């Protein structure tokens, strides 16, 4: 491996790996094992081989969040497990905030995408002008009033923006209204609810679906997204990457796969381009679910891809 890209916001290449083995934002088991599989694949040593000094943060260690998924009283209206999600994401928030404020790049391994409530809020505490690239097949911007499933992994962006605040569960009222709609751009969308489409349009949020990738090419889409969330060209960048942005042909072991996604090469090129900006300050890799694989090869494909996303974002280059 070689590592050439610069990282302008860090005097030294120091990085905190935050493990977030949490599945309470959705009903399927197994996604809580994503971090363990990524680490077993050698991700930490891979990152260190790129010149990063790493520390390991485990904010959920010692807490039994999995048994809490069976608590049928943990509801608020249609919202499922808000107390569980609120507790877990607050711990993740404190951990990511600590890593960021110590001058380290935060790499958080999930876990379902509800953990981004904590990661994004933690990063924006340190870098309030950061632009957020949300790489996902889904918009994850349903509110407490629009969600049909009640699964909070489909709602993290709305909590971060403070949308529908009057209906926010008490356990999630700690979440700061920290995300400006002008500071987020989506790439890879292909499964968006009707209510979400309205939210995106009403808030003027930059949203690039697979149609835009096909029409303009991925490199142009990345450039357009960066111009939206970081118009000055020097702002920090955070990437929250749901592996289902990549087509299930390459990433089969994930909770809500949607055909017609990014190719594996496109999925890696995306973060390679972000690394080239020199402005990456945080990365999430979420929704790897080994239990949803139909055979061992699917586990290997998915976990290997998750590790590759992290390495490419952190500066791995071929030449």
From Swiss-Prot:
Single GO MF annotation: manganese ion binding
Residues where Mn(2+) 2 binds: 136, 138, 242, 244
GO biological process, one term: urea cycle
PROSITE patterns per UniProt: ARGINASE_1 (PS01053), ARGINASE_2 (PS51409)
EC assignment: 3.5.3.1
SUPFAM superfamilies in alphabetical order: Arginase/deacetylase
Cellular-component GO terms for this entry: cytosol; nucleus
Pathway info: Nitrogen metabolism; urea cycle; L-ornithine and urea from L-arginine: step 1/1
Residues at which substrate binds: 138-142, 149-151, 193, 256, 287
Chain positions recorded as Mn(2+) 1 binding sites: 113, 136, 140, 242
Textual note on the cofactor: Binds 2 manganese ions per subunit.
SUBUNIT field: Homotrimer.
Full protein name: Arginase
Protein species of origin: Kluyveromyces lactis (strain ATCC 8585 / CBS 2359 / DSM 70799 / NBRC 1267 / NRRL Y-1140 / WM37) (Yeast)
Source taxonomy: Eukaryota, Fungi, Dikarya, Ascomycota, Saccharomycotina
Gene: CAR1
